[in-house]
Amino acid sequence: MDRFYSLSHSSIDFHFKQTPRDFVVEEVPLYEFCGEGEHLILFVRKKGISTLELVSMIAKYLGIKNKEIGYAGLKDKHAMTKQYISLHKKYEEKMDTFEHEDVKILSKTYHNNKIRIGHLNGNKFYIKLKKVNPTSALKIDEALKNIASFGMPNYFGYQRFGTDGNNHIDGELIAKGEKKERNPKVRQLLISAYQSHLFNLWLSRRLEINSLIQNFDVKELEPLLNIPQDELLKMKSQKHPFKLISGDIMEHYPYGRLFEFIGEAHDFDRFNAKDISVTGLLCGKKAKHSTGLSREIEKDFDDEINEDGARRYAWVFPKDIDGRYKDEEAQYELNFYLPKGCYATVLIEEIAKRKIV
């Protein structure tokens, strides 16, 4: 899908390919490991293989089932990644002799529980952009400063939608009972892609509204957006690039309870201070809906499917952003941290202001 971007610069030309040399990910765990307990915790570096391939490889080596190995999240295949896995410590001695050319065990410790999906705070990234000229490097500098100050939209990345980008199409058919999928994991993957697609469409629409708010007068906007003048004036006065609308569902950041935004001044301040953020809908049962004007926009991207829904941060705040231009190599290197569930490729696309695949 074509989408709106949050930054105002023109698109930046550079080369990016997701390879282990140019794309490095390091997992940041949810908690410190205590150093004792029946679970062996391995910090593993891998390149060119997915998390599930790593798990299958180790399970086969140990003669155990894949489900006996714990991990917090799925890491990219086309990258150099460092992540934690857990298994019973009775396998420690055999793992001491485990060898693979694309896998290295960097360290080990112990803990009193198995690592499970979601047991991570986020990920640290190192990324290299190539064929960058000095003018583009300056534009990248400014884009990173803007993201460091205000944050960025939390789109689902292209990886969510499969190699052909069409997983959401099958997901919609399955969710509506028009197509069958016997494998429960594949079924859930495809339906999630459909939910993610609707979320991305909604987020792009909100960014389009932001752009219109910034570039047109209130008198021009009222008939264009069908939003009352007093609400448009409130949106115009907001300093943040993502304009909050009455009825938005907010969430304490980086985690916490949901609550409804009713336009109170201290909530604008908390959003600017990165203490709260706005959420978008992942359609389905049990999901909290926005209200009022916000719901008028959201309902066009909702679908009453018989699956559990949720809210997802629509706007996130990357941390520890650092960029360096290497003139002689025409390369730009950047480091940053993203909370779990966020895509580094989305940040790169925000900088480029275009698709990168």
From Swiss-Prot:
The keyword Phosphoprotein does not apply. This is tRNA pseudouridine synthase D. PANTHER family: TRNA PSEUDOURIDINE SYNTHASE D. The active site is at D76. GO terms for molecular function: RNA binding; tRNA pseudouridine(13) synthase activity. It is an enzyme of class 5 (isomerase). InterPro entries: PsdUridine_synth_cat_dom_sf, PsdUridine_synth_TruD, PsdUridine_synth_TruD_insert, TruD_catalytic, TruD_pseudoU_synthase. PROSITE patterns: TRUD. It catalyses: uridine(13) in tRNA = pseudouridine(13) in tRNA. The keyword Nucleotidyltransferase does not apply. GO terms for cellular component: cytosol. Residues 151-331 form the TRUD domain. GO terms for biological process: tRNA pseudouridine synthesis. Belongs to the pseudouridine synthase TruD family. Responsible for synthesis of pseudouridine from uracil-13 in transfer RNAs. Its EC number is 5.4.99.27. CDD domains: PseudoU_synth_EcTruD. The gene is truD. It comes from Sulfurimonas denitrificans (strain ATCC 33889 / DSM 1251). Keywords: Isomerase, tRNA processing.
